[in-house]
């Protein structure tokens, strides 16, 4: 292409900056401008990695948001970028000309013969099909697409010295009025963009004007009523051609299989049949339009012109295919959503695999491709689960009832908050309004909406999915990022599950018969709080060698390992733990062995209560404070458990531990880092036992008397109901229990979880509490104490397998 940029807007400009450069309007235009010889830079508040890479390869400089470069001569901005944006304000202050994306596009193609692809639904796919057919025919032309081809098979824009250029023309912001095409293709027309077209007639007037400005040929869908009304007015100078089932260029869908569809062509077509790597009636219409225009331009079209059509990203792209199949689609209008759900219903979500190893499919609508044949992974008639993010408040207000009607076709619906696209909220234009419409129609029983918590919505979605489901993320906002993040987590979980299937037989073949190894063992009965779900795998090794086998196999497969003692001082999530939970519950870990030097070796699985009892019988004093702690020696070592003014490491001389690599070590107390409720060396290792030093020898009756004193104090000051022990750490210089009590929280409940009326730093299970109840009560207590005293209470109990920071 020319190394010298063309003049634009009567200006000699060489340096252009793009605002919103990551969007599908500006990114291809930026690529085209760079190919024309302009020096281009761009910024965006949220880059898509694929777009960044394409622009960077083309030499477009990517700048920080709000950092308008000093040498810029012209600013081109997306209509979604408000005048208050930092870079726009800086451009205004510097007196720089600023134009919208559509204005710039019209300016750089005005010296060419323009093929404008316009309309409401399907213009990106139709444009991509036309580009594909012309490229295959080696027809000389340039193009600017409003999207990205799947697999980067073709660039989204290509400058050319040829006379012809194809461009996807958008009507949403009124810049469509700037174009004077040689050929115009209107795929269909539907009322949208109420912020710019308050009435249906306004949209019709705009397209009538576009067709009146078209010089050579017009291609219209034979099924579009608005297009028919426009042509009936007369006054058009260009020749008018229709495409569709009964149009001048006739197109019928003969067959539709996983590898694509076969079309019967008739009327003015020179071909009798065509193969299209796409699916559904809507894409048959898109293909008919593309082939008709290609033939009109003089390109040599064949039966296979679209046989290897790559499709467009975010157009019914299959993001993941396994026991749950996940799609994403750009549909953001009720008409598009109805067609999308109908197509997914019909095809049962059967995917296909392309030669690049990525999955993509379209089943009708304005959407992406089918690809090379692959076996269906799903049962017929799967459950259809939809996640929908409305796009723009104005569109939501305009179509809230229609959205509700279209979305009612889902078996399960998850609603995200509106993607504003720079708009301010308008009355009746929120997700809550769509939800209200669904309630009004009686279709809300399968709907989940968590206002202001899209992250929480994804957690609920994950728990609701079942094997065999088809899941589709729908919308034109940033829901694509949400979809990809969700799929990444889903893939990780599926990879983890495959690892478990490898772990179990490998471990069982090497473990002793005495070792217990169970799948999905319920953990609630093994805890003092009596809440929580199952462990993915639960093990009770019988010996050191068994524990080493478990750790080696888990490390080989990168599976998480968690330790469970007596189950005190922890809360297990209701969903359970996706990890290997190891308990030293076998009798071999419960040793109490007096040593010749007066010390005791206590196994990690020995209950503290039993330790005290055995020490009392042996006449060994100094362990009495441990008697009422509902734990084991291993747990007490890891947490440096304490009570009645004593701490576990007060009586420890050395610890025997096993690293997660399976190495057995003995560490003297002096070499360990121990503080309040924490032993650093045991955070990533397993205590096997410890050598304990009694304070002195004494009569058993005297020791028993001290234990009785502690027991009486405990009974009087601590609740008897199931609990995890003290919930919060004591803040410096204060008592957590006193702060909670002074906030009036004794007896406060969430579900069956209650702040104890005996000791406010205990949360008790009144019978049927869940982990969610307890977490909810922890949040409530923290908030009330913070409001009353300005103190942030930190949990002392562990959230097993998770981090408190992720839920608080």
Predicted regions, residues:
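Active-site beta-alpha connecting loops in nucleotide-dependent enzymes
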Residues: 12-29, 40-47, 312, 344-347, ...
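N-terminal leader/targeting and accessory segments in enzymes
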Residues: 1-104, 273, 279-281
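Phosphate-binding loop of NTP-binding sites
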Residues: 32-35, 56, 70, 79-222, ...
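Structural signature of FAD isoalloxazine-binding scaffolds in flavoprotein oxidoreductases
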Residues: 539-544, 571-590, 638-668, 682-689
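Short Gly/Ser/Thr- and charged-rich N-terminal loops/segments
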Residues: 355-377
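Anion-binding (especially nucleotide phosphate/pyrophosphate-binding) glycine-rich loop
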Residues: 500-633
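Adenine nucleotide phosphate-binding catalytic loops in nucleotide-utilizing enzymes
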Residues: 14-15, 19, 78, 197-205, ...
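Phosphate/pyrophosphate- and phosphate-bearing ligand-binding catalytic cores of soluble enzymes
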Residues: 519, 570, 658-808
């Amino acid at each position: 292409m020319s190394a010298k940029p063309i003049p634009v807007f009567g200006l000699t400009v060489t340096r252009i900056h793009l605002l919103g450069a990551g969007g599908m309007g500006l990114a291809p235009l930026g690529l085209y401008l760079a190919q024309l010889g302009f020096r281009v830079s761009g910024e965006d508040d949220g880059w898509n990695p694929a777009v960044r890479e394409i622009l960077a390869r083309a030499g477009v400089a990517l700048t920080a948001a709000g950092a308008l470069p000093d040498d810029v001569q012209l600013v081109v901005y997306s209509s979604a970028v408000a005048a208050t944006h930092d870079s726009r304000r800086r451009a205004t202050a510097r007196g720089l000309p600023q134009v919208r994306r559509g204005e710039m596009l019209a300016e750089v193609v005005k010296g060419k013969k323009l093929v404008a692809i316009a309309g409401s639904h399907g213009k990106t796919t139709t444009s991509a099909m036309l580009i594909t057919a012309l490229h295959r025919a080696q027809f000389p032309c340039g193009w600017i697409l409003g999207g990205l081809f799947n697999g980067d098979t073709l660039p989204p824009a290509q400058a050319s010295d040829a006379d012809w250029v194809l461009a996807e023309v958008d009507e949403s912001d009124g810049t469509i009025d700037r174009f004077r095409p040689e050929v115009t293709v209107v795929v269909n027309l539907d009322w949208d963009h109420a912020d710019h077209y308050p009435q249906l007639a306004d949209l019709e007037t705009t397209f009538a004007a576009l067709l009146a400005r078209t010089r050579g040929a017009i291609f219209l869908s034979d099924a579009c009523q608005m297009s028919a009304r426009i042509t009936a007015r007369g006054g058009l100078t260009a020749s008018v051609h229709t495409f569709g089932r009964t149009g001048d260029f006739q197109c019928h869908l003969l067959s539709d299989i996983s590898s694509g569809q076969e079309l019967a062509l008739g009327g003015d077509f020179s071909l009798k049949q065509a193969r299209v790597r796409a699916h559904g009636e809507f894409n048959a219409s898109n293909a008919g339009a593309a082939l008709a225009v290609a033939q009109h331009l003089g390109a040599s079209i064949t039966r296979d012109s679209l046989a290897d059509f790559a499709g467009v990203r975010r157009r019914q792209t299959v993001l993941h295919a396994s026991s749950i199949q996940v799609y994403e689609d750009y549909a953001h209008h009720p008409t598009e959503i109805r067609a999308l759900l109908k197509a997914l219903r019909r095809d049962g979500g059967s995917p296909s695999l392309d030669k690049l190893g990525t999955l993509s499919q379209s089943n009708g609508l304005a959407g992406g491709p089918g690809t090379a044949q692959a076996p269906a992974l799903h049962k017929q008639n799967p459950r259809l689960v939809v996640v929908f993010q409305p796009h723009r408040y104005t569109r939501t207000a305009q179509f809230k009832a229609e959205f509700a009607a279209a979305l009612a076709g889902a078996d399960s619906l998850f609603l995200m908050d509106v993607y504003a696209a720079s708009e301010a909220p308008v009355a009746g234009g929120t997700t809550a309004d769509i939800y209200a419409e669904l309630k009004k129609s009686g279709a809300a029983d399968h709907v989940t909406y968590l206002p202001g918590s899209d992250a929480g919505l994804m957690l609920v979605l994950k728990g609701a999915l079942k094997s065999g489901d088809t899941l589709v993320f729908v919308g034109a906002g940033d829901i694509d990022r949400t979809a990809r993040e969700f799929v990444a987590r889903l893939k990780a979980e599926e990879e983890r599950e495959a690892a478990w299937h490898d772990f179990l037989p490998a471990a069982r073949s090497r473990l002793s018969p005495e070792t217990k190894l169970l799948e999905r063992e319920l953990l609630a009965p093994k805890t003092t709080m009596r809440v929580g779900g199952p462990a993915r795998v639960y093990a009770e090794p019988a010996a050191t060698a068994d524990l080493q086998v478990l750790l080696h196999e888990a490390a080989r497969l990168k599976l998480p390992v968690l330790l469970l003692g007596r189950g005190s001082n922890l809360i297990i999530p209701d969903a359970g733990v996706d990890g290997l939970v190891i308990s030293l519950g076998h009798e071999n870990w419960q040793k109490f062995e007096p040593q010749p030097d007066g010390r005791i070796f206590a196994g990690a699985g020995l209950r503290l209560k039993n330790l005290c009892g055995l020490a009392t019988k042996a006449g060994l004093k100094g362990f009495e404070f441990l008697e009422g702690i509902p734990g084991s020696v291993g747990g007490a070592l890891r947490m440096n458990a304490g009570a009645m003014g004593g701490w576990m490491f007060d009586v420890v001389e050395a610890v025997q531990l096993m690293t997660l690599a399976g190495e057995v070590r003995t560490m003297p107390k002096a070499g360990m880092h121990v503080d309040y409720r924490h032993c650093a060396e045991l955070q990533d290792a397993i205590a096997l036992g410890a050598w304990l030093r009694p304070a002195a020898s004494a009569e058993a009756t005297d020791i028993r008397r001290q234990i009785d004193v502690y027991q009486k104090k405990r009974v009087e000051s601590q609740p008897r109901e199931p609990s995890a022990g003290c919930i919060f750490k004591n803040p410096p210089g204060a008592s957590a229990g006193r702060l909670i009590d002074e906030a009036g929280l004794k007896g406060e409940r969430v579900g069956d979880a209650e702040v104890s009326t005996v000791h406010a730093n205990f949360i008790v299970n009144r019978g049927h509490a869940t982990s969610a109840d307890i977490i909810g009560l922890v949040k409530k207590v923290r908030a009330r104490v913070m409001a009353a005293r300005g103190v942030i209470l930190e949990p002392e109990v562990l959230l097993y397998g998770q981090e408190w920071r992720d839920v608080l």
